[in-house]
A protein has these predicted regions:
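Conserved amphipathic alpha-helical segments that form helical-bundle/coiled-coil interaction surfaces
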Residues: 65, 77, 84-150, 162-174, ...
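Unusually extended, aromatic-enriched hydrophobic runs near protein termini
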Residues: 1-13, 27-30, 40, 162-188
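Short linear motifs at protein or domain termini
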Residues: 1-82
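Active-site loop of classical SDR/Rossmann-like NAD(P)-dependent oxidoreductases
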Residues: 157-159
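Loop-to-transmembrane-helix entry motif
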Residues: 152-155
């Protein structure tokens, strides 16, 4: 999954369960089972007789995932604005600092690191409202949007990520629901 999300395996690339099994030092059966699970998320295309391919990023699936994500996050942000805690400000500040420092880093793992920090940011409001399981569930089926987000980070196409996060976090911490939601809508 991660190799597809982080573009180590690119859309259209052919996959061999035999080669994957050798690379992962395991038998072919668990590799085949993993490929079947990935096909259920439209991340790979299983073609009997001709092999397996990394699926392209699907525009229709992106739209579904984006709608689901925006709908859930807006509601969670509204709840977070109503239930601020003193700790929440510190947690958001820590995340924002980590993203800022990570964005200045030239580490080869920079994209993975920034993506993880970004995901953590979006999970904070869920955690603050006691809805972390909802976040984990949502995140588990957001495969195509994750791939697009990684591509965006790779192309440095969105330099406003931390700025948007700062506005959202500050609005949540002081309970300005409208600003938090409007910024989230623009951000996503």
């Amino acid at each position: 999954r991660d190799k597809i999300i982080y573009m180590d395996l690119k859309p259209g690339e052919s996959l061999s369960d035999k080669i994957l099994a050798e690379q992962l030092e395991m038998s072919r059966t668990p590799v085949r089972e993993a490929l079947i699970r990935l096909s259920a998320y439209n991340m790979v295309v299983l073609k009997p007789q001709s092999g397996t391919l990394v699926a392209p990023i699907d525009a229709e699936q992106l739209e579904i995932e984006q709608f689901s994500r925006l709908t859930m996050e807006k509601e969670i942000i509204k709840l977070a604005c109503q239930n601020q805690t003193p700790e929440l400000k510190w947690v958001y500040e820590s995340n924002l600092r980590a993203y800022e420092l990570g964005s200045k880093n030239d580490d080869p793992e920079k994209i993975r690191h920034l993506h993880e920090i970004d995901n953590n940011f979006h999970g904070l409001a869920f955690a603050a409202t006691g809805k972390i399981k909802s976040y984990l569930h949502m995140h588990s089926y957001m495969q195509h949007i994750e791939r697009l987000r990684v591509l965006t980070l790779m192309m440095k196409a969105d330099n406003n990520i931390n700025s948007d996060h700062t506005t959202i976090a500050n609005a949540i911490v002081v309970g300005i629901e409208r600003l938090a939601v409007e910024t989230l809508e623009k951000h996503l």
